[in-house]
Amino acid sequence: GLVGAPATLSTAPIAYGGYGGYGAYGGSLLRAAPIARVASPLAYAAPVARVAAPLAYAAPYARAAVAAPVAVAKTVVADEYDPNPQYSFGYDVQDGLTGDSKNQVESRSGDVVQGSYSLVDPDGTRRTVEYTADPINGFNAVVHREPLVAKAVVAAPAIAKVHAPLAYSGGYLH
């Protein structure tokens, strides 16, 4: 192949040529570099790989077969059902310190509930509610109001205000 060398620059002395202006002696300032001839290589060598070859190959391991999960039979337990449910409860509160007075009683036999409750309203009357509930008639309540027996008001004893006599001063002299 051909290998080109870089071009070279040569300078020549400059002289005044009279009415023709300035100019250089001789030829051009730029000259081509000589062409060098280089022989092409006859063969190329492949690079040497410096990697060790594996000593042996192993087959992939065999996976164990997995069985499907075993179905477990579940027994269904039915909720207990009482065709004739029964209950009864009650309470009574009589608090002399706070004046709280209330009570309630209730009972159930099958689908029928009966009961009552009472309390003292802020105006001093006792309210009593009697109720029943069943699938045919629904919930029904009857309200009774009755005044409480007023407590006898005991008058506080009157305290007489007596002024103490003035102390004896022994008279007044002129």
UniProtKB/Swiss-Prot annotation:
Cellular component aspect of the GO annotation: extracellular matrix; extracellular space
Highest taxon listed in the record's lineage: Eukaryota
Gene Ontology MF: a single term: structural constituent of cuticle
Alphabetically ordered keywords of this record: Cuticle, Repeat
Ranges for the Sequence repeats: 45-48, 67-70, 155-158
Record InterPro entries: CHIT_BIND_RR_consensus, Insect_cuticle, Insect_Cuticle_Struc_Prot
Domain Chitin-binding type R&R: start-end pairs: 84-150
Comment, domains: The tetrapeptide (A-A-P-[AV]) repeats found throughout the protein are also present in many proteins constituting the protective envelope of other species.
PANTHER family, per database record: CCP84AA-RELATED (PTHR12236:SF94), STRUCTURAL CONTITUENT OF CUTICLE (PTHR12236)
Annotated function: Component of the cuticle of the larva of Tenebrio molitor.
Protein's name according to its UniProt entry: Larval cuticle protein A1A
Organism: Tenebrio molitor (Yellow mealworm beetle)
Biological classification of the source: Eukaryota, Metazoa, Ecdysozoa, Arthropoda, Hexapoda
